[in-house]
């Protein structure tokens, strides 16, 4: 496995791979890898000749009062895992390499970027789409792999890819969970044992919505209120949002008959966590499954 630090070197590698007729799979990450990331890597490994994992803690997607400074950084451990998984290249540039003169040019998906997490974290998705756009230019991959856990991010990036005509296939992989249902997240490392238990309320809220949908309820307002009531039962959780929306537009819907995204975000202590499930239709929901 080769660690690449500069844009020029990474671009040269990709040109060589394409000349050789090799397909490229890209897994963008901010490091602090867990089993969810590794599931993306393993999927990419089975579908591409070469796999590139980017590790870059992107400062422009963090707000002024967010956790940029303390975001987990475990580069050596991450590289050991990726080497074990057969990754070919790790692209890990510094901030000065990615933004040598600061950032004057942004990629912004209007409308979608202000919904769900974008409403609570102004400017977050503009930072995400800007760095992902740069990565897609630096690493012209055939496939890029993202996790369903970041459902709003997936919707925003999918719209960016369509609007900007990126020649890349987005591969969205299922959420990976602990046995008790907690969605894996790098930010879970912030939780103490008590908070770790409190965090399970997100999973319980989603399961309540799924259970009601499976018994025939289709009214989105009723289902969302039922999920919010579960969050309200946990004193250690502060609800940011629990909404039922169209998975592509992130617009609220009234009936779940044609499918819906149930998205939730809550603060546990000082840690903000997100989770979601997709309801296929009343009586047929695809949601949290333990792995």
UniProtKB/Swiss-Prot annotation:
Q: Which residues form a coiled coil?
A: none
Q: Give the function comment from the record.
A: Catalyzes the condensation of pantoate with beta-alanine in an ATP-dependent reaction via a pantoyl-adenylate intermediate.
Subcellular localization is given as: Cytoplasm
Q: Which GO terms describe its molecular function?
A: ATP binding; pantoate-beta-alanine ligase activity
Kindly indicate whether the keyword Methyltransferase belongs to this entry: no
Domain of life of the organism encoding this protein = Bacteria
Q: Can you say what this protein is called?
A: Pantothenate synthetase
Any single Gene Ontology cellular-component annotation: cytosol
Quote the InterPro entries the UniProt record gives: Cyt_trans-like, Pantoate_ligase, Pantoate_ligase_C, Rossmann-like_a/b/a_fold
Pathway(s) it belongs to = Cofactor biosynthesis; (R)-pantothenate biosynthesis; (R)-pantothenate from (R)-pantoate and beta-alanine: step 1/1
The reactions it catalyses are: (R)-pantoate + beta-alanine + ATP = (R)-pantothenate + AMP + diphosphate + H(+)
Binding positions for beta-alanine? 61
The EC code for this enzyme is: 6.3.2.1
Query: Which family would the database say this protein is a member of?
Result: Belongs to the pantothenate synthetase family.
Taking the first listed entry, what is the main subcellular location of this protein, grouped into a coarse class? cytoplasm
Record-linked SUPFAM superfamilies: Nucleotidylyl transferase
What assembly does the database describe for this protein?
A: Homodimer.
Please state what class of enzyme this protein is.
Answer: ligase
Binding positions for (R)-pantoate per the UniProt entry: 61, 153
In which residues is ATP bound?
Answer: 30-37, 147-150, 176, 184-187
Q: Which key words are in the record?
A: ATP-binding, Cytoplasm, Ligase, Nucleotide-binding, Pantothenate biosynthesis
């Amino acid at each position: 496995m080769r660690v690449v630090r500069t844009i020029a070197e990474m671009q040269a590698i990709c040109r060589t791979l394409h000349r050789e007729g090799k397909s490229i799979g890209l897994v963008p990450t901010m490091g602090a890898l867990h089993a969810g990331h590794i599931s993306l890597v393993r999927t990419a490994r089975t579908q591409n000749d070469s796999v590139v994992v980017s590790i870059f803690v992107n400062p422009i997607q963090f707000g002024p009062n967010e956790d940029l400074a303390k975001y987990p950084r475990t580069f050596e451990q991450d590289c050991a895992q990726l080497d074990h998984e057969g990754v070919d290249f790790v692209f890990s540039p510094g901030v000065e390499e990615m933004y040598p003169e600061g950032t004057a040019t942004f990629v912004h998906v209007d409308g979608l970027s202000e919904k769900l997490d974008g409403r609570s974290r102004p400017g977050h998705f503009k930072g995400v789409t800007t760095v992902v756009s740069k990565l897609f230019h630096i690493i012209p991959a055939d496939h890029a792999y993202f996790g369903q856990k970041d459902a709003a991010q997936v919707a925003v990036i999918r719209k960016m890819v369509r609007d900007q005509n990126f020649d890349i296939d987005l591969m969205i992989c299922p959420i990976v969970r602990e046995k008790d249902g907690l969605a894996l997240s790098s930010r879970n490392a912030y939780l103490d044992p008590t908070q770790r238990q409190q965090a399970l309320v997100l999973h319980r809220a989603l399961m309540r919505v799924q259970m009601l949908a499976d018994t025939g309820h289709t009214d989105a307002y009723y289902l969302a209120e039922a999920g919010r009531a579960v969050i309200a039962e946990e004193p250690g959780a502060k609800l940011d949002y629990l909404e039922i929306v169209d998975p592509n537009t992130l617009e609220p819907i009234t009936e779940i008959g044609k499918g819906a995204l149930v998205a939730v975000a809550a603060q546990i202590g000082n840690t903000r966590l997100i989770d979601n499930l997709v309801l296929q239709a009343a009586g047929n929901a695809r949601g949290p499954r333990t792995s």
